[in-house]
Amino acid sequence: FRNRLLFPVHDVRGRCIGFGGRVIHEGDLPKYLNSPETPYYRKSLVLYGLYQGMEEIRKSREIICVEGYLDVIRLHEYGFKNAVAPCGTALTEQHLQLVKRYAERVILLFDGDDAGREAARTHGRLFLPHQLEASVVMLPDGSDPDSFLLDHGADAFRELLLKQMPVLDYLLQQTLSKYPDSLQGKLKALDELLPIFAEIKDQTLKQMTLNAVAEKMGLPTSCLLYTSDAADDSGC
């Protein structure tokens, strides 16, 4: 951790269990380093900022999940004290179980670049089997939460949060927009959507989703229902 800015990581009881370190003078060194895992510090079980934001999270029953340590610190500084981030890893099922102990809603807030959009898709799918309300907010191109707050302030950030999109709607929109409105394009989109359908455990929501996608694709719902059921049976 020499010549690095250190971020103490706490468990839910407030005990310091590890550190994240950001390089001060960027060069050939890795930008971030984290403490090695121990019986007390396991990255898949810890969210940075959760302990510090516990009071606000319990009150609002909502969490804003961002990508990095500096994003969490900036959000807390500007009054958004329910912000958390994974410690140098992707969100995991264990993280979701931790979140469900304290919150009912999660806002996924990612950087406005290709990596951020991919993270929103990957992390968003993780929520589909769970009874946990999740939505996605994408920042403008080239922005991250830290820089957006510095450039535009808290009021603009609140307005941005109002534009959140339910995670399932986001996944469908992102997938359908990738392909042309042709037979081949629809087949490719459907192939990518099948695993998403399979992860929706609520049957009413699944049927509503199939209806909406069928309408957008100009296909009969029975076609999507048959394809989805076949994919479920094959373990897709």
PLM region descriptions:
Residues Y226-C236:
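Single conserved hydrophobic/aromatic residue that forms the stacking wall/gate
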Residues V23-I24, D113, G235:
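Short, glycine/serine-rich, charged loops/turns that create anion-binding
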Residues F80, G142, D233:
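ATP/adenylate-binding site constellation spanning eukaryotic-like Ser/Thr protein kinases
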Residues F1-Y102, V106, A119-A120:
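Phosphate-handling DNA/RNA-contact segment within nucleic-acid enzymes
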